[in-house]
Amino acid sequence: MDPGKDEESRPQPSGPPTRRKFVIPLEEEEVPCAGVKPLFRSSRNPTIPATSAHVAPQTYAEYAITQPPGGAGATVPTGSEPAAGENPSQTLKTGAKSNSIIVSPRQRGNPVLKFVRNVPWEFGEVIPDYVLGQSTCALFLSLRYHNLHPDYIHERLQSLGKNFALRVLLVQVDVKDPQQALKELAKMCILADCTLVLAWSAEEAGRYLETYKAYEQKPADLLMEKLEQNFLSRATECLTTVKSVNKTDSQTLLATFGSLEQLFTASREDLALCPGLGPQKARRLFEVLHEPFLKVPR
């Protein structure tokens, strides 16, 4: 009997040939690390440790405190990510130049817009309520609305992030006792690194928005104090900081003693002899000139 013929005469199974399954047991310490794709599938399903769900902070203070410190691997949200359902192409990016105030559609119907008359404004898909310049924006908040929805401003500040260099929180004070609410908002602005501006009416709030936009390209010289460069003006400014010493007294002292060195070393009697100065002004000036810079504890 030929064994080869017997094998040929056997009925062959229909369909593709079945594959043998090899089971490779793994010890507990040989479980592949997370993120590494194993070469073989284990017969046992290793238990994956459950990760604790990240709880979103409820206030801006918690949000600011829980952020990672600055470093090579630290990631800090900037607030530039578009919100859910928001088209990124419709969002005005920081640095985009515009001659108008860009108003968020969420401010539609705000009475403040009726008083923005001196500068143009238009609606646009932006993260803040008002974009006042290339690096300036504003969030509007009514204290009456804040008392009803205290979490609203926390969420807005989180979404805004650090998108703009100057971030203004424009608050309309429309309640009778605003002290406690303003105290909380002031702390929040310190944490958020934004400027708190108070307005007692919608008209005043509109003027603030107009002013920020109108002075967008103006230098800061208008806000800075003009300092005189000549010696007489600067010496007069220094001496008039003493209580009850005016510009006339300052000019008399400089004309009498000739220099600040002679004035500083003069006695109380010499100061009192100056015309128009008197003993009381002389005593105050002498005490200021001879007061130590550092207070010595007694």
Curated annotation (Swiss-Prot):
Linked residues for Glycyl lysine isopeptide (Lys-Gly) (interchain with G-Cter in SUMO2): K21, K37, K243
Keyword terms, alphabetized: Acetylation, DNA damage, DNA repair, DNA-binding, Isopeptide bond, Nucleus, Ubl conjugation
A molecular function GO annotation: single-stranded DNA binding
Region (HhH2, dimerization with ERRC4/XPF): 220-298
N-acetylmethionine PTM sites in chain numbering: M1
Motif segment (Nuclear localization signal): 17-23
Disulphides: none
Compositionally biased region (Polar residues): 87-99
Chain residue ranges for the region called Disordered: 1-24, 66-99
PTM: Ubiquitinated with both 'Lys-48' and 'Lys-63' linkages. Deubiquitinated by USP45.
Gene3D superfamilies: 3.40.50.10130, 5' to 3' exonuclease, C-terminal subdomain (1.10.150.20)
DNA-binding region(s), residue ranges: 134-156
UniProt entry tagged with the keyword Acetylation: yes
Pfam families in UniProt: HHH_5, Rad10
NCBIfam families documented for this protein: rad10 (TIGR00597)
Family according to the record: Belongs to the ERCC1/RAD10/SWI10 family.
Complex and partners: Heterodimer composed of ERCC1 and ERRC4/XPF. Interacts with USP4.
Functional note: Non-catalytic component of a structure-specific DNA repair endonuclease responsible for the 5'-incision during DNA repair. Responsible, in conjunction with SLX4, for the first step in the repair of interstrand cross-links (ICL). Participates in the processing of anaphase bridge-generating DNA structures, which consist in incompletely processed DNA lesions arising during S or G2 phase, and can result in cytokinesis failure. Also required for homology-directed repair (HDR) of DNA double-strand breaks, in conjunction with SLX4.
Protein name: DNA excision repair protein ERCC-1
Species of provenance: Mus musculus
